[in-house]
Swiss-Prot record:
Disruption phenotype: Impaired development, multinucleation, fruiting body formation that is delayed by 36-48 hours during the development in addition to stalks and spores that are thin and smaller. PROSITE patterns: ALPHA_KINASE. Residues 1-15 have a biased composition (Basic and acidic residues). GO terms for biological process: contractile vacuole discharge; contractile vacuole organization; hypotonic response; mitotic cytokinesis; myosin II filament organization; regulation of sorocarp development; sorocarp morphogenesis. Residues 87-114 form a coiled coil. Displays a modest preference for threonine over serine residues. Does not phosphorylate myosin II, however can phosphorylate MBP, in vitro. May be involved in the regulation of myosin II function during cytokinesis. Overexpression leads to impaired cell proliferation in suspension culture and fails to develop beyond the mound stage. Both overexpression and absence of the gene can result in defects in cytokinesis and alterations in myosin II abundance and assembly. It comes from Dictyostelium discoideum (Social amoeba). It is found in: Cytoplasm, Cytosol; Cytoplasm, Perinuclear region; Contractile vacuole membrane. Interacts with calmodulin; in the presence of calcium. Its EC number is 2.7.11.1. This is Alpha-protein kinase vwkA. Keywords: ATP-binding, Coiled coil, Cytoplasm, Kinase, Membrane, Nucleotide-binding, Phosphoprotein, Serine/threonine-protein kinase, Transferase, Vacuole. Residues 1-64, 602-625 are annotated as: Disordered.
Length: 625
């Protein structure tokens, strides 16, 4: 964390008056008010009083009000000779909004460009092909087509090439290593792997460095998502990496250095995954590689690992690794295309916070201090269609609470860090913070957008549960209550998202760019997404469904909402193109039929029309994006 926590010794009121906020206008309220100095206008006494009560004056408690509300307060009681100015300001605001919409629509186009680019994947297998590895070589060969098909189902723009590096050990005098250059042909890939005969390996360690040294000789495509899957059951030579008998205890006999290998991997922007078969033998090496990679890259890269001992589960692990890599690439490319690598508030290059992941969830919070936070929570809207209006103001409540936060995050995604914490009642919570330093990423609006999205999704879920009239509670859909914390008494504003800790196996059921999990357990959640579009009168759809299956149903978090109002719900709102991507993949199921849901038909010139269907809609939906 770049700012120190500051504890308050002051006794303060825990509750704040409730207020309202139009989240999409939060970036314009300060600009609008700064253009209108209350001190230079003829402000009636009654208006000054209202401003003071609402936090517009320099003193008193503050509540959050929207741009629209603020302008009403400032201009509502102005003298007759100032009405012309007010009209001009309204016209200016309308023009500014038009520009914002145009800009956002262009950003959505660039986001889809990033999605397409991220699905250009170069997948390289590096495999120990000594005597004990036959079952794993065979598994890769038999799974490669299934892997490709599974990826195609999730990524409509997939363009994947496969490569292979085979290595053995120094007792194999000739042909110790060999390569298969990247190719789209699974037939050629299978032919190469079929000709491999496992052999060699007189001592325990193998020529790992020799295999890794060939990575730079592969013909990586420019800007591709680059993934290395390294499968091995033995470490490299050099006693600092293991405790086995070693014919080359001083390390690689050809003088290959680990730092050079890892520098190549980092400079090539490779996502490296080590599939260990015998962690007892390779664990020390993997940990050493990971630590050194983080050191050289300044925590921008790491060596990931997974258990590949069971050959039947290996393909699933590889699939997940590729998924993670595509997600990271998509985020990076989106930033590049949109220019978000420059912090909008400072004009400086965006930089990551310094952090170290600690996956230990058994934390002793006893010695950690409580930190005072201002907690903001939105009230659930009373009506779905109304809350989707561009002028809708979310009702909010504020309260001062105390939280203990773990010093290190336990997980991270493409954009956020996740910290474990406990509240003043001893309840486990998760605090989420931007990975990046800077005003754009850490603005109150950014956090409020996420909270608004989850609150509106929760309203959809509540109404969905009522309409479905399910007899079993196992299908009930619930979103955790999202809140925003602002650290009190810190030098600079510091925000966190906060939710109840979800205990269980976390799953993703669909994404915000068209992928849907195709299994029986996720059917009800795909129906939920479909239903939200119809229930909103074709204005919005809740996607990016993820969370935990519990005995009471589905407990979900971090949704996205695609809305025809592209200024709402943050950067994950991909507007009408995002809605279309869902229906290109969605297949109606028994739950859709029970609710009488219909598949919309999209054209570039019309909004939506409906036609019933129970199979894929990709052939009937067309829209230019």
């Amino acid at each position: 964390m770049e700012s120190k926590y500051v504890l308050s010794t002051e006794k303060e009121s825990k509750t704040k008056p409730s207020g309202r906020v139009n989240v999409s206008d939060m970036d314009s309220i300060s600009n609008s008010l700064s253009k209108t100095s209350l001190g230079t206008r003829k402000v009636p006494t009654s208006l000054k009083t209202d401003a003071s009560r609402s936090g517009l004056s320099s003193g008193g408690s503050k509540t959050h009000i929207s741009d629209e509300s603020a302008l009403r307060m400032v201009y509502g009681s102005t003298p007759r000779d100032e009405k012309t100015t007010t009209t001009k300001d309204s016209i200016t605001l309308a023009k500014e909004k038009e520009k914002k919409i145009e800009k956002r629509n262009e950003e959505i186009k660039l986001t889809f460009k990033a999605i397409r680019a991220s699905e250009c994947v170069d997948l390289l297998f590096i495999v120990d092909c000594t005597g004990s590895m036959d079952p794993y070589i065979e598994q890769i060969k038999s799974d490669i087509v299934k892997l490709q098909e599974a990826l195609k189902l999730k990524h409509s723009f997939l363009d994947i090439e496969f490569g292979f590096i085979r290595y053995t050990d120094f007792d194999v005098a000739s042909n110790r290593c060999s390569t298969f250059q990247f190719s789209r042909s699974t037939v050629e890939f299978v032919r190469f792997v079929s000709e491999i005969r496992a052999g060699g390996g007189a001592d325990g360690p193998e020529d790992v460095f020799g295999g890794m040294d060939l990575i730079k000789s592969m013909k990586w495509r420019p800007n591709s998502t680059r993934v290395v899957i390294h499968i091995a059951d033995a470490p490299c030579h050099g006693t600092e990496y293991h405790s086995m008998a070693d014919s080359y205890p001083g390390g690689d006999p050809n003088g290959i250095k680990l730092d050079d290998l890892l520098t190549d991997i980092i400079s090539l922007n490779i996502n490296y995954y080590f599939g260990h078969i015998n962690l007892k033998e390779t664990g020390q090496m993997i940990d050493f590689f990971d630590k050194k990679t983080k050191e050289i890259s300044r925590n921008k890269k790491s060596i990931n690992s997974f258990d590949s001992k069971e050959t039947s589960k290996m393909n699933e692990r590889i699939f997940i690794s590729i998924e993670e890599s595509i997600s990271v690439s998509r985020s990076v490319l989106t930033e590049q295309y949109l220019g978000h690598n420059i912090d909008g508030s400072t004009g400086k290059q965006r930089s990551e916070r310094e952090f170290e992941i600690n996956t230990n969830m058994d934390i002793d919070f006893g010695e950690l201090p409580y930190i005072q936070m201002l907690q903001t929570k939105f009230k659930m809207p009373s009506d779905i269609v109304t809350c989707l209006s561009s002028s809708y103001e979310m009702k909010l409540n504020e309260i001062t609470i105390s939280i203990k936060i773990a010093p290190n995050p336990f997980s991270h995604g493409a954009c956020r860090l996740a910290y474990l914490g406990i509240d003043e009642h001893g309840k486990k919570v998760v605090l989420k913070q931007s990975k990046y330093i800077g005003g754009r990423e850490n603005s109150k609006k950014r956090y409020f957008e996420s909270m608004e999205c989850q609150t509106v999704a929760a309203k959809f879920a509540l109404e969905f549960n009522k309409q479905l009239s399910l007899t079993s509670s196992e299908h009930q859909i619930t979103f955790t209550v999202a809140k925003v914390l602002q650290m009190k008494h810190s030098e600079k504003p510091m925000y966190f998202g906060i939710e109840t800790f979800i205990n269980g196996e976390y799953q993703k059921y669909n994404s915000n760019c068209g992928w849907l999990k195709d299994d029986a357990m996720s059917e009800i959640l795909q129906t939920f997404s479909h239903w939200t579009y119809q229930e909103s009168k074709n204005k919005a759809i809740v996607v990016d469904i993820q969370g935990v299956k519990t005995s009471k149903g589905y407990l979900l978090t971090d949704p996205a909402i695609h809305s025809t109002d592209t200024l709402r719900f943050g950067s994950c709102n991909l507007g009408k193109p995002g809605i279309i991507k869902f229906f290109q993949s969605h297949k109606c199921n028994q739950h859709c039929k029970k609710l009488g849901l219909t598949i919309p038909s999209f054209t570039s010139s019309s909004s939506t029309s409906s036609s019933s269907r129970s199979t894929s809609s990709s052939s009937s939906i067309s829209y230019s994006y």
